[in-house]
Amino acid sequence: ELLAATGTGVAHCPVSNMKLSSGIARIPEMLRMGVKTGLAVDGSASNDGSNMLEEMRVAYLLHRLNSSSEAPSGYDILKMASRGSASILGREELGHLAEGMAADFFAISLDRIELVGGQYDPKSLLSCIGFKGAVDYTVVNGKVVVEQGRLVNVEEEKIVSRANAAVEKLLYIK
């Protein structure tokens, strides 16, 4: 009640909560009470993958398991991940597509065997069916940064090689 009354936002990080055994956030109750609720991946120390699409599906399934019919719908989870998270950050120009807003979005082709039927409920697809792998296109502030699943402004292979070298150096410090 205090969170709702004070306008305090909650960043829900279910994968981190599971990894750290820190419990299950009472998201269905928070949503009913009008608590501003977003979805986040926390950080690499407590969420090795930092994959927001995975976080959406995990949030959906976790609350279905824990809260059954009171659980947020797949579309509710999408709204938490987009508008909800933007609102918590005080960034009302983010989290939805509209004229004059930042054009940040991604696109995936539904022409994949694992997404068959997804076109009939696109608002719930990411939470209910889930999506693994690289998205087909990502646009940030109106500029394409991922095309056909690959970063367009950097050489991924070089980044991976440099990152792996840095990890090896950190792991084998003597």
Q: PLM features: residue spans?
A:
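Active-site core of metal-dependent hydrolases
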Residues: E1-G49
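Conserved strand-to-helix beginnings and helix N-cap segments that scaffold or border functional pockets
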Residues: G23-I24, G49-L53, Q119, E157
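His/Asp/Glu-enriched, well-ordered alpha-helical/loop segment
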Residues: P28-R112, C128-G130
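Short, positively charged
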Residues: G74-D76, D111-Q119, Y172-K174
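Short, solvent-exposed cationic patches
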Residues: V160-K174
